[in-house]
Amino acid sequence: MDSFQNEKKLYGLIGYPLGHSFSMEYFNEKFESENINAEYMNFEIEDIGDLMEVIAEYPNLCGLNVTYPYKEQVLPYLTSIDDAAKAIGAVNVIKITRGPKDNDVELRGYNSDTIGFMKSVEPFVNENRKKAMVLGTGGASKAVTYALRKLGIEVMLVSRQKSAATHTYDELTKAMVNEHKIIVNATPLGMFPHTDTCPDFPYRFLGKSHLCYDLIYN
């Protein structure tokens, strides 16, 4: 029992690529400063199908963060999903619970993206900012959209692909941009190593009253 309690717990991040991520450095410094017997690793897997191999190879792995492009792709591999994550349709946190047998593993998915985004954007929401444009339609976009609607903000989705639920960048007019005072980049554009890329958005229509939020932190 003592050896089990003293065993260093392992946590990590799955995604591809991971060259832009500072999660490993951040969490390992946090574990050390808080005197937590744990380690954080990056698992740069090229296919989500490699997830179970990672879990089998590291028996002390207790949890994972999930980043692009697997926040939606990981769903079929989960044993259960938190209600909020289920409503969002994307997961960025996995809790790993192991039973007595090697193949007895339970994976429960959660979404903390929506919590972090909501807390950071809420102080800037006012009566003049009741409509938002969210650029992108992936897992990050779903979390952002969920959070904005929780704050009572109307959301317009913008994508390169036209659909019944989205507008394309070519369709955006000055009046539409002016009406939506919150603009969120939830696309992977700008992510390392392609840091000079950005959405094909009509930036000339932005004004001083707009709140622009970029999820790409590098």
Model-derived features with residue positions:
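Gly/Ala-rich phosphate-binding loop of Rossmann-like dinucleotide-binding domains
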Residues: 145, 149
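Rossmann-like adenosine-cofactor binding region
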Residues: 165-218
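Phosphate/diphosphate ligand-binding glycine-rich loop within oxidoreductases
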Residues: 4-124
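Glycine-rich Rossmann-fold phosphate-binding loop(s) that bind the pyrophosphate
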Residues: 16, 136-138
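Short helix-loop-beta connector
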Residues: 125-131, 207-208
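Conserved beta-strand elements of the Class I
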Residues: 12, 131-135
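NAD(P)-binding Rossmann-fold cofactor-contacting core
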Residues: 150-169
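N-terminal Rossmann-fold NAD(P) dinucleotide-binding loop
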Residues: 141-142
